[in-house]
Curated annotation (Swiss-Prot):
Residues 300-310 have a biased composition (Basic residues). It is found in: Nucleus. Its main location: nucleus. One of its GO terms (cellular component) is nucleus. Interacts with MBD7 (via C-terminus), IDM1 and IDM2. Part of a complex made of MBD7, IDM1, IDM2 and IDM3. This is Increased DNA methylation 3. Gene3D superfamilies: 2.60.40.790. Residues 169-199, 300-347 are annotated as: Disordered.
Length: 463
């Protein structure tokens, strides 16, 4: 059944309405413990006014995160686009007939729970709290059974902190945060085709790099004979992988995705000729390229070379790699390389060299504070990183670093790090103070993929 012209189904409407009315409740002083909106209606509790409501509040992003976390096991066809959820929170969904279907503002009217917008990405709803364990005794049995069937949840209890947190994906192969909001597109009715969402609750573009890697791997397996040419090694060069006459992916080539080869002058010339001859069929390497293809490509490259480069000892490149031994250094050279000088130019020359972790920038606004902290190599997954803010403005960051190892394995080789300037791996704790007192409840964090942790927090009214 469709509730309006854009195709919102009754199941989709039922789920969003059930979650917002049973997992949220007004912050009424007399309700101890706090009750959900549906529970108050079922129990016939007296109405409340602004004088009875506490100072608790939730951001719109947290409400969206709550919706997606509760429906983490549901079918993707039942999930709504964040824009649709935002319209529901505002009471703007064009449901027909009008007034028959309650929306968020029916349970939390704006005259008692005002929605204030501090910035384009920071909007709060005042006077509401999360109910982590809804009382099922006050829920209609048919509605409860329908919700359990659609959400695939047997237990309605949730974790208060996790339910309001964004569902972050971590790409373990690169140890970087991937903001893969979805692997499909939102349809016209606002249905999302995946279950992964980013920290702001807003759906981003599909993870193009991940799709591209799959396309490249398929292209390599299906048509290996078209890949006999040399693959570009330089980072930043963009190529197009074409499969069955259609362009599949355009990505950035990374040095670490290939074995280390020595560039020969004739190789560079041959690359230019082959690129002109087979435009659109060159493949950019990815970490998902099959190992057997890389070995085949490696053997074919040296086999097809009409002239093998030799060093002064008469060893070819293949022979040198087979008999790869450490190059002896004189004691003077070792001493000179023990403490290399670091020369910086451009904007980097204006920075003060020091620890790579813990550099802080703080911004001040009339209503809020903004800070950025450099945390390169810090784990982002749950349980490994935490941020606590006290009312006096003290910020405490705790986590663990993954860089600075003594031995590093790259390209089937083990390197012993003689010079180590990065922070060693292990737990750390970082504390700094904001210029004034703040309201810890009104905090919007964001851990960026480039290793910068930033946050916006509302200042205390009296500060």
């Amino acid at each position: 059944m469709s509730l309006y012209s854009d195709g919102l189904s009754s199941d989709q409407y039922f789920l969003v309405n059930f979650i917002m009315s049973n997992y949220l409740g007004p912050d009424v002083y007399s309700d101890n413990p706090r009750c959900s909106s549906s529970q108050r209606l079922a129990r016939g509790l007296p109405p409340y006014t602004l004088m009875h409501i506490g100072s608790s509040s939730l951001t719109v992003s947290q409400l969206q995160n709550l919706y997606y976390n509760v429906l983490r096991n549901a079918k993707s066809s039942l999930l709504l686009h964040p824009d649709m959820i935002y319209m529901y929170l505002k009471g703007y969904l064009p449901l027909e007939p009008s007034g028959k279907f309650p929306q968020f503002t029916h349970f939390f009217p704006t005259n008692l729970h005002p929605q204030k917008r501090y910035s384009p990405s920071h909007e709060i709803v005042k006077g509401i709290v999360v109910i982590d364990d809804p009382a099922v005794g006050f829920i209609n049995k048919e509605e409860l059974q329908r919700f359990r069937c659609l959400s695939r949840l047997d237990d309605l209890k949730i974790d208060r902190v996790t339910s309001l947190s964004p569902r972050v994906n971590l790409d373990e192969s690169r140890e970087t945060e991937q903001d893969c909001s979805r692997n499909g597109d939102a349809t016209a009715n606002g249905v999302v085709t995946n279950e992964d969402y980013n920290s702001s609750g807003e759906l981003q573009e599909t993870c193009k790099r991940k799709e591209g890697e799959d396309a490249v791997a398929s292209c390599v397996i299906s048509e290996p004979e078209r890949l006999s040419g040399d693959i570009p090694e330089s980072q930043g060069m963009k190529q197009d992988c074409s499969r069955n006459g259609e362009s599949a992916f355009s990505g950035i080539v990374s040095d670490q995705d290939y074995y280390s080869f020595v560039k020969l002058p004739e190789t560079c010339k041959r690359k230019n000729k082959e690129e002109e001859a087979v435009t659109g069929h060159a493949v950019s390497g990815t970490s998902k390229t099959p190992e057997r293809f890389r070995e085949t490509y490696k053997r074919r490259r040296f086999k097809n070379s009409s002239k093998k480069a030799t060093n002064k000892n008469g060893e070819t490149l293949m022979e040198r790699e087979k008999t790869d031994k450490p190059i002896p250094f004189s004691s003077e050279m070792k001493e000179s390389d023990a403490e290399p000088s670091v020369v910086t130019t451009g904007t980097a020359s204006k920075e003060t060299l020091g620890s790579s972790v813990g550099v802080v920038d703080i911004g001040v606004n009339k209503v809020a504070y903004f800070f950025q902290v450099a945390l390169p190599g810090v784990r982002k997954d749950y349980g490994e990183f935490s941020c606590e803010i006290e009312s006096d403005g003290k910020v405490i960051l705790e986590g663990s670093t993954t860089r600075g190892e003594k031995n590093i394995k790259r390209h089937s080789r083990v390197f012993e790090m003689n010079i180590r300037k990065l922070c060693p791996p292990g737990p750390f704790k970082l504390c700094f103070n904001l210029p004034g007192p703040v309201d810890p409840r009104l905090f919007s964090p964001n851990f960026r993929s480039d290793g910068i942790f930033e946050g916006v927090i509302i200042r205390h009214k009296n500060s």
